[in-house]
């Protein structure tokens, strides 16, 4: 059963001509500053003129400062009479939960483990790495295998400098991967948090922060400019945008079930839920990707 993101919001934003119909919102964690909020609104809001953002009950528009954002109701006001604002029609992808189990993934997994050796989100080191025990640690794809065709259309292979050969599409490069604890990986895939490469790699949670990761910074081990295996900023930027769309636009995208014990009817769960066609297509491409030949 899909879960709602909007129910926990404590920030809402509006077109003042419709003051009781929010255009979207946000669950506020301490890492969200006024500057970051205004930047994220640029992903969601379209307008035919410049606009300013006002917290209701205050006398000045929001300035792009590093002061913490306050919870409440915000009006987006066009700077010229008759100005129009609207919400983008861009939508985040329907992403299945990644499962790295095929031969095609093995090189990716080994390279991410070798580079990171810890959860780069929480900072927790794997003390058993020396004996190749990676229980509860997962090599996560930033851009998912299920959307490899989109990866190609966006010309993202151009950013990858570390790959296995000329026929490699680069989506399985370690530069598209991060090592995480397994439960953190599920949160990453469900767009519950994201890393902002344009804010010093700060982590922002868009839901309750159970692991204390909001406001942390992506561990430097995976982004060392001197390491040819370093993670690609453009992929992190893409994931951050997807997370903003999933959490802040309209009522928010549903959070899909991820707890499937052995024998579960995953297909039945997908078909009976929202965005069924997109999710089925993504699941199919994800499975096909894992049985395709190793490049």
Residue ranges, per PLM feature:
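A boundary/linker detector
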Residues: 1-116, 124-130, 136, 260-295
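A detector for short metal-coordination/catalytic motifs
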Residues: 136-137, 143-295
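Short hydrophobic "helix-edge" motifs at membrane interfaces and signal-peptide entry regions
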Residues: 130-131, 173
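Short cysteine-rich clusters marking metal-coordination/redox-active sites
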Residues: 119-123, 181
């Amino acid at each position: 059963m899909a879960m709602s993101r909007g129910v926990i919001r404590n920030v809402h934003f509006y077109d003042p001509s419709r003051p009781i119909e929010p255009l979207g919102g946000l669950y506020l964690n301490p890492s969200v500053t006024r500057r970051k909020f205004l930047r994220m609104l640029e992903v969601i809001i379209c307008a035919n003129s410049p606009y300013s953002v006002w917290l209701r009950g205050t006398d000045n528009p929001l300035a792009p400062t590093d002061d913490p954002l306050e919870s409440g109701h915000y009006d987006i006001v066009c700077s010229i009479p008759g100005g129009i604002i609207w919400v983008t029609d861009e939508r985040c992808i329907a992403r299945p939960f990644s499962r790295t189990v095929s031969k095609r993934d093995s090189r990716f997994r080994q390279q991410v483990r070798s580079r990171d050796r810890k959860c780069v989100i929480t900072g927790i080191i794997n003390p058993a790495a020396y004996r190749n025990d990676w229980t509860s640690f997962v090599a996560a794809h930033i851009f998912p295998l299920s959307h490899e065709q989109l990866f190609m259309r966006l010309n993202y292979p151009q950013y990858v400098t570390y790959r296995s050969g000329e026929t490699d599409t680069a989506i399985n490069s370690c530069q598209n991967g991060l090592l995480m604890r397994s439960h953190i990986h599920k949160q990453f895939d469900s767009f519950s948090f994201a890393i902002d490469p344009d804010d010093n790699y700060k982590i922002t949670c868009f839901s309750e922060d159970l692991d204390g990761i909001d406001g942390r910074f992506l561990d430097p081990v995976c982004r060392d400019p001197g390491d040819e295996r370093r993670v690609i900023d453009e992929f992190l930027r893409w994931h951050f945008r997807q997370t903003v769309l999933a959490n802040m636009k309209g009522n928010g995208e549903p959070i899909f079930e991820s707890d499937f014990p052995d024998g579960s009817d995953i297909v039945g769960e997908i078909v009976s839920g929202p965005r069924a066609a997109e999710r089925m297509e993504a699941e199919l491409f994800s499975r096909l990707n894992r049985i395709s030949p190793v490049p």
